[in-house]
Regions:
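Terminal helix/beta-alpha structural elements that buttress the NAD(P)+-binding lobe
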Residues: 1-231
Length: 231
């Protein structure tokens, strides 16, 4: 297949009017940009899909697709990661920045597939608490000041989407050695303390969680097509 002038593609593009790419092998579904300068990033970020070959693509929803697909895709990968690791034996997950779209998507998927098996707690600001409760994505919604209200004694995963070192430290101080995994996903609190600002936290050491790594796992196991259909 050839790339035809006028073809619309989906992928991660620079904020610019133009970009020069070097396509590798072109398939019915899309191509990969093989420029040397792009070799330092995970392969997923260099892949571009032809929208005409995308299942479920609709031109009238392009803006929504551009906004929500990467975010919900991350939510899906978070859930997949949890399943692959059997939730590290935990029965509860705490998600920070519960009003963020990625957190909402993750909460929705957990409620859909694991309601009653894995408890989810969404942490948010006081001003957003009522909104988040109305989403019905989490079993419990608490504000950041209410971390001391989380019952102790249950093994609990942490997915930190806020990127707020103080909030993570408060969670670790509260839950301690019942935290088998603590993953940093995003940074919606862009002006908060940097990752790792607090050292020697009780429980599992916070680590960066990687969506591209989980993509690689799924592609190896079920292939790209099946992964996209599941998503």
């Amino acid at each position: 297949p050839d790339i035809i002038v006028g073809d619309r593609i989906y992928g991660f593009l620079p904020i610019a009017s133009h970009v020069t790419m070097i396509p590798g092998e072109v398939s019915h579904g899309g191509f990969t940009d093989t420029r040397e300068c792009r070799a330092v990033v995970p392969p997923f970020y260099n892949e571009y899909a032809f929208t005409k070959a995308e299942p479920g693509y609709a031109p009238e929803f392009e803006e929504a697709i551009m906004l929500f697909r990467p975010l919900f895709g991350t939510s899906f990968l978070m859930q997949s990661y949890c399943e692959d690791h059997d939730f590290y034996g935990a029965k509860r997950i705490v998600v920070t920045s519960a009003s963020a779209k990625t957190a909402m998507g993750f909460g929705y998927l957990m409620r859909k597939h694991f309601s009653g098996a894995i408890e989810t707690i969404g942490l948010t600001s006081s001003k957003n608490k009522a909104f988040v409760e109305g989403l019905d994505c989490y079993d419990t919604v608490l504000t950041y000041d209410e971390v001391p209200l989380i019952p102790v004694g249950t093994d609990t995963l942490i997915f930190d989407i806020a990127g707020n070192a103080d909030v993570v430290a408060a969670l670790h101080a509260r839950l301690g050695n019942t935290i088998p995994y603590s993953g940093a996903v995003g940074k919606t609190h862009w002006n908060a303390g940097a990752f790792g600002a607090h050292r020697d936290l009780p429980g599992a050491k916070p680590v960066f969680w990687s969506a591209p790594d989980q993509i690689a796992v799924l592609r190896e196991r079920i292939g790209s097509g099946a992964m996209m259909r599941q998503m």
